[in-house]
Amino acid sequence: MESGKTASPKSMPKDAQMMAQILKDMGITEYEPRVINQMLEFAFRYVTTILDDAKIYSSHAKKATVDADDVRLAIQCRADQSFTSPPPRDFLLDIARQRNQTPLPLIKPYSGPRLPPDRYCLTAPNYRLKSLQKKASTSAGRITVPRLSVGSVTSRPSTPTLGTPTPQTMSVSTKVGTPMSLTGQRFTVQMPTSQSPAVKASIPATSAVQNVLINPSLIGSKNILITTNMMSSQNTANESSNALKRKREDDDDDDDDDDDYDNL
């Protein structure tokens, strides 16, 4: 810091000498030389602004010249805008005391970066994982129909002919207690066939249980109609007995013819 007395008063301009005198009157004795220039620039800018505002107020009041009242009004308006004093110390202490009464958030027990609560952070993931749904393979095997109650069985045998087996059509009407979704599934129904005790050992017997494949597209929500073609052992027995009877009748006729021939 250099003293203001180092520069000779005679070499300084009149405005600089006046500013140095103002600083001396305020008790400022040590300052840099450029402080005088900054203060002069500030004073020039401030005075110019005040006079411009005073001229505007005078023209608004329809006055011919700028008087002292206009200058006072301009200084008052500029002081309210530019020069604001800081708040009192007591006021600042009261605000600080109220702020310090708020407790700080608890420190997390685990180690790591000291971050605020999760709702204030942007570290949460903004996406969701979609679970892969495994589609059940319908062609893996056959499914047995559970809880099928057979209501009525009707048999309608057709008229048999010699030499050719006649298939028998059976319609089974069943009811399902609860509607089931059987789309795209195949299942097996086991049905016992009726066997007649008159079947001889020479006649090939059919299987006791036959498997019937049901197409799910033909199944309704309540009733199931099963139609199958199977060989009737009873019809086969009837055919064989009829053939034996006819053979015996033919033999009897031949014997009668022989007796008549002998009598002649």
UniProtKB/Swiss-Prot annotation:
Using the UniProt annotation, give all residue ranges assigned to the region (Disordered): 149-176, 232-264
Which intervals carry biased composition (Acidic residues)?
A: 250-264
Relate the induction remark in this record.
6 to 8-fold by apoptotic signals.
Give a GO molecular function annotation for the protein: ATPase binding
Give the Phosphoserine positions (modified residues): 149, 152, 155, 158, 181, 196
Name the residues that span the membrane.
none
Question: Could you give one GO CC term from the UniProt record?
Answer: nucleoplasm
| Pfam families xrefs | TFIID-31kDa (PF02291)
Q: Which InterPro entries match?
A: Histone-fold (IPR009072), TFIID-31 (IPR003162), TFIID_subunit_9 (IPR051431)
> Which keywords annotate this record?
Acetylation, DNA-binding, Nucleus, Phosphoprotein, Transcription, Transcription regulation
Tell me where in or outside the cell this protein is found: Nucleus
Query: CDD domains this protein is in?
Result: HFD_TAF9
Give start-end positions of Polar residues composition bias. 151-176, 232-243
- What positions does the DNA-binding region cover? 120-137
User: What the protein does?
Assistant: The TFIID basal transcription factor complex plays a major role in the initiation of RNA polymerase II (Pol II)-dependent transcription. TFIID recognizes and binds promoters with or without a TATA box via its subunit TBP, a TATA-box-binding protein, and promotes assembly of the pre-initiation complex (PIC). The TFIID complex consists of TBP and TBP-associated factors (TAFs), including TAF1, TAF2, TAF3, TAF4, TAF5, TAF6, TAF7, TAF8, TAF9, TAF10, TAF11, TAF12 and TAF13.
Whom does it interact with, and what assembly results? Component of the TFIID basal transcription factor complex, composed of TATA-box-binding protein TBP, and a number of TBP-associated factors (TAFs), including TAF1, TAF2, TAF3, TAF4, TAF5, TAF6, TAF7, TAF8, TAF9, TAF10, TAF11, TAF12 and TAF13. Component of the TATA-binding protein-free TAF complex (TFTC), the PCAF histone acetylase complex and the STAGA transcription coactivator-HAT complex. The PCAF complex consists at least of TADA2L/ADA2, SUPT3H/SPT3, TADA3L/ADA3, TAF5L/PAF65-beta, TAF6L/PAF65-alpha, TAF10/TAFII30, TAF12/TAFII20, TAF9/TAFII31 and TRRAP.
Q: What family does this chain come from, according to its entry?
A: Belongs to the TAF9 family.
Protein name per its UniProtKB record? Transcription initiation factor TFIID subunit 9
Q: State the organism of origin.
A: Homo sapiens (Human)
GN (gene name)? TAF9
